[in-house]
């Protein structure tokens, strides 16, 4: 009898643990109806809050934004608070995968920005810009009409992004000195 009580207790604890983990993880399905002409930002670095501030200040820009990166949800939540006009959704997955970009409704997006991704990097580490080129190729295979803006740190990657049909290529020293 004591053994049965122990087994039931362990089983109940395991079920409760699974249910709590699912509740904390949240529901990652998005309502497709509000995503049309929206902005998708892939990658995370120190310039994202400045970009969001510019978008928030521009009344003519879209207010629906999807952030796709592997940065911790708490960091993203703290960074995006205070943008009253913007409807920001975070997908915490690897943006180089086609399935993840489809989850962000890239085929319906107005603009897709690819930024150097500092997710999980130490302060002295540089982001892998091959991910930018790969993501641009993946995005164009999903939606040729999507406006892809790629941000690179190394000028040598510009030719690769041109071959990948990026609509705009941003090089920090040349384009965004105020960020």
Regions flagged by a language model, labelled:
Residues 1-179:
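Cytosolic regulatory regions of ion transport systems
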């Amino acid at each position: 009898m004591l053994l049965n009580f122990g087994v039931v207790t362990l089983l109940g604890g395991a079920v409760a643990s699974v249910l709590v983990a699912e509740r904390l993880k949240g529901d990652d399905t998005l309502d497709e109806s509000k995503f049309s002409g929206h902005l998708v930002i892939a990658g995370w670095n120190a310039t994202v809050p400045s970009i969001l501030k510019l978008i928030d200040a521009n009344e003519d820009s879209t207010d629906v934004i999807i952030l796709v990166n592997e940065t911790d949800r708490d960091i993203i939540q703290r960074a995006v608070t205070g943008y009253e006009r913007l409807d920001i959704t975070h997908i915490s997955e690897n943006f180089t995968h086609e399935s993840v970009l489809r989850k962000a409704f890239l085929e319906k997006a107005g603009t897709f920005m690819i930024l150097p991704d500092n997710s999980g990097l130490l302060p002295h580490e540089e982001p892998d810009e091959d991910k930018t080129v790969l993501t641009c190729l993946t995005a164009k295979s999903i939606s040729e009409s999507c406006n892809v803006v790629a941000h690179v740190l190394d000028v040598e990657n510009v030719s690769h992004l041109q071959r990948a049909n990026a609509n705009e290529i941003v090089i920090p020293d040349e384009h965004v000195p105020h960020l």
